[in-house]
Amino acid sequence: MTPNEFFSIKYHILAKAELKAYIDKLADYLSQQSYLYHTLDKPIISDSDYDKLFRLLQDLVNDNPQFKPINSVLDRVGGEVLAEFETIKHKKKMTSLANVFSLEELRDFYDKIEYDIELECEPKMDGLAISIFYKNGKFDYAVTRGDGIQGEKVSENVKTIRNVPLKLNTSNPPEELEVRGEIILDKQSFLSLNEYMQTHENKTFANPRNAAAGSIRMLDSKVVAKRPLKLYSYGIGYFSKDFVHPETQFELMQLLQSFGFTISDNMFLAKNFSEVEEYHHKMSHQRADLAYDIDGLVFKVNNIKLQDIIGYTARGPKWAVAYKFPAEEVESEVLNVEFQVGRTGAITPVARLKPVAVGGVIVSNATLHNINEIKRKDIRVGDRVIVRRAGDVIPEVVKSLPQYRKSDAQMVEMPTNCPVCDSAIENVNDQAIYRCTGGWHCQAQTTERLKHFVSRKAMDIDKLGAKLIEQLVAANLIKYPADIYKLNFDQLTGLERMGAKSSQNVLDSIKKSKTPSLARFIFAIGIKDIGEVSSDVLANHFGSLESFRDAKFEELIEINDIGEIMANNIVSFWHDSLNIKIVEELLAIGIKIQNPVKVEHAYNESFTGKTVVITGSFENYGRTELTQLLKSIGAKVTSSVSKKTDMVICGDNAGSKLTKAQELGVEVILEDNLKDLL
């Protein structure tokens, strides 16, 4: 049918069965047009006709909700807001590829296979990995990679992506099929999204990858539906026995394209290593001109049977490898050096640069780490410098180019007083770190401490973001954590960009945070060097805030994961009258700390009461899953190896923890033996 034929039908006089058939036919037609437009880039109807037909379908379903078609284009507009994402297990482990960083290492991979082979070559998209499960050809659910064993179910968000098939384009779909791919934002869409975000929300994303990942993890799919995300498929995971698997990887990708998935235009079949080198050379030079960001190339053995023979490690397939591009480096000029103050008072020099594009992002600031690094690299204001950015790493100044140095270039000196509060700056034990001594009296430290206090792993006041904290501090509405709980509706609505609904959401979020676990509360109050894991250890050991507050140094250093420096910091924290006042104000204003419940663990001869460290990756367990399993049988799982450690459970690619365990004579358990002990 054509658009005009759909419009010509007098649907308002149709019988119920006829109306349902008309709605189904219209939904199928729109799905086909969406596929032609978003996947094949070959539309056959105008945007105007598509929009009119889409509105017609919406109106018909609104008037006749009992006839709403399953997995139609209507599902792309988003649904109800979720409270949280469900965690579900992958039917087939979602592994990672081994990395190589040079052509020599890529040649080693090729030679180890010991066959004359073809390699299927493709760009390595820099986005969010996703797995989409289809049942009898219809979209069932979508899940993120997570830890490879399990991930977050993000079905409603993924359904909004225009080029994700809601039905497979085949008359004979397999009973079950899991399709895997990368969700991305192309460069132009990213720039447009950031312009919108800057105008409407006064914030932007750092890069397209963060934008894609952040969008998919939003709880409101209606917002996600407005984001120009795109899926590129790169393979399959689990499939039922009735799936007719092609003989080669290249043919598999063509099959997925016929099902309705978008695949890369830059896929290539290399018949020998010489062609692999040619592809590498071509893509390295075309990288900057691609519509989307890539951070490397992927090479897969083309023959599927040969893939099965070559096999897998616990981490991933031995028949595929990812070539990672070297960190991108460009030249820029240091316009100025400013000093930022962090949550603990640490002073960090930051170079203000002449804006330059690097790694897909416009960079105008770069870290200089500390004053010792500045002196070692001899970086001066006015210098031309090399700036590097790799992945999500904060851009850094690698080195200066003294051959271009101007005569008026200025050396950088560490200030003696805080640039924010004018308190003295101290250097303890002649280390590289200098700190402002102002504490809560320094507005910069106050702001960062309050950001930490409300953060997701602390008090989890999710509607109270970093920008709003900055506004509240600048307006003198909050100075200490308890002030957050004194905020009222009028104060919030009086701030820029804060309407009635947003203000009420903030107040609801604050109220919801009043019953934190003891571990969250310890983490939130910001004791120096006490992170999330240490807070959990301390909460479980002491059981209450009162016991923790009264802890002596001698008791603290006996606790696994708590060393002398951390113990000293804890004792010093509770000897500071201002810290005690801050905590008491929080308790007085209604914070009800939930103490950990003592759980009776199942007894296990090998693990109950033992201190265990996990290192490496495992074939049959995710790290989170294994940690929870060990805790359930009474083991204490810690993050570092020490003399107090009873055993180290070791998977593939174990690093320094295994070395330290061997040096200390700590028992090492391999995954092969773990199942018997459990």
Curated annotation (Swiss-Prot):
Hey, what's the signal peptide range on this chain? none
Which controlled-vocabulary keywords does the entry list? DNA damage, DNA repair, DNA replication, Ligase, Magnesium, Manganese, Metal-binding, NAD, Zinc
**Coiled-coil segments on the chain, per record:** none
**Which positions in this protein are listed as binding Zn(2+)?**
418, 421, 436, 442
Which positions fall inside the BRCT domain?
Answer: 602-678
Task: Enumerate the catalysed reactions.
Answer: NAD(+) + (deoxyribonucleotide)n-3'-hydroxyl + 5'-phospho-(deoxyribonucleotide)m = (deoxyribonucleotide)n+m + AMP + beta-nicotinamide D-nucleotide
Which of this chain's residues are annotated to bind NAD(+)?
A: 47-51, 96-97, 122, 145, 182, 300, 324
- Extract the Pfam families matched here: BRCT (PF00533), DNA_ligase_aden (PF01653), DNA_ligase_OB (PF03120), DNA_ligase_ZBD (PF03119), HHH_2 (PF12826), HHH_5 (PF14520), Nlig-Ia (PF22745)
Q: Which cofactor does it need?
A: Mg(2+); Mn(2+)
The molecular function terms of the Gene Ontology recorded here are: DNA binding; DNA ligase (NAD+) activity; metal ion binding
Enzyme's top EC category: ligase
| Alphabetical list of PROSITE patterns matching this protein | BRCT, DNA_LIGASE_N2
Q: Name one GO cellular component term.
A: cytosol
A biological-process GO annotation? DNA replication
**Active-site residues annotated for this sequence:** 124
Function text: DNA ligase that catalyzes the formation of phosphodiester linkages between 5'-phosphoryl and 3'-hydroxyl groups in double-stranded DNA using NAD as a coenzyme and as the energy source for the reaction. It is essential for DNA replication and repair of damaged DNA.
Q: Identify its protein family.
A: Belongs to the NAD-dependent DNA ligase family. LigA subfamily.
* Protein name per UniProt: DNA ligase
Task: Recall the taxonomic lineage recorded for the source organism.
Answer: Bacteria, Pseudomonadati, Pseudomonadota, Gammaproteobacteria, Thiotrichales
Q: Which gene encodes it?
A: ligA
